[in-house]
Amino acid sequence: MRTIAVIGKNFGDEGKGFTCSRLASSLKKSLIIKHNGGGQAGHTVEDPEGKWRFIHHQIGAGAEYHVPTLFADSFMPDLFQLGKEVKDFTELFGFQPILYSEKNARITTIDDVLLNMGAELARGKNRHGSCGMGIEECVQRNAAGYGITVEELATWSNQDLLDRLKQIRKEYTGRRIKILGIQAPASSKAMKQSNIRNPSTASTASTSSNPTNSSTFSNLSNPYYEMLNNETVLENFVEEVKENVKLLTLVDADRKWLEQFQHLIFETGQGLLLDQDYETYAPHLTSSKTGIHNTAIFLDKRGLSLDEAIYVTRPYVTRHGNGPLPCEMDRSELPGVGEDLTNQPNEWQGTLRYAKHESLEAFFAPVLRDRDSVNCLERMGETKRPDLPKLAILVTQLSETGNQLYFDEGNIPFETIQKAGEELGISCVKDIGG
């Protein structure tokens, strides 16, 4: 069994979806494993001839080639959003994707999303740059002891699930609202209790778009406060996720189950520089491990190890969201770089930002740090020291830049990067196949 991890080298948006799809299409009997974050990923795959284009959020990139997806127990699926993604996928490709999930994967709830959106709105100019998909709030809720697993959601009745969500609101969410500074709009404080007693009079929440522009509101006027006190929001959530959980086949993904596959492709969300422990860019990070950490633990539990880690980068750097971006510049200052069709301007992350790579040393540093991080797992009591995987850096979109990478110190030919990587034990490539 061959095991491969696909990882973003920078801040995300490097071409991980393209890479996973290429691997899945060329390797026999593959399984795509989603292992970090949740529904906030946006991995784009396009047909080489331009016949179709699809953005994968939770469905593995490569599912278009009939390759199944597994949600590992460290993945936090957003079952509220999954239904639409499966519908769009099925309409485009003509078949429903095969989706497995470990039974103890922890779901993201509607209140996680609303808390996330409300917190970002309350932060104003100090936003973290979140996607607004509730991952940090899902992590916090689980840490407080209020988790809900996929198996629980699947086996509970609608009423059981609704009761559990109400309990979480009563015992936990109210405290979290205060911590995050999400306050009721002054004009609606008197209406709040009325809406709770009579949910039919409250508006139905929608998380597909932001209901207001943040520049209009302050901490004292946060529309998400009302939604977090609206029982109809929970009722609609329960109805949707109880239907969407039927799209998953729950499995015990032990070694015996995995042996039906010849290749395991670990599709990682975000990028190394957004890892929850990459202090340099705190607090503008994601609430998950974005390197080989989760993969190493998953495999070690099953007596397996990681064979290869592929770190994906563009010839330049992008960042979608707030936070430091060294060597930042306007896209027009990067010759040949075209518009990004996936990362469109939005309320939560703003406009996609561009930069040059800092230096050769900084270019390789995150990969070396990630490689060395697995040596720490034994000291953390999480796993034995694994065999180190083969390391590769895949540079995508070199056709935009004439086979060179843009660095602050000047443009560097790809071949020069290759030679520098060889000295560090890292293979640099510009194409990926089986």
PLM feature spans:
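Compositionally biased, intrinsically disordered low-complexity segments enriched
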Residues: R197-N219
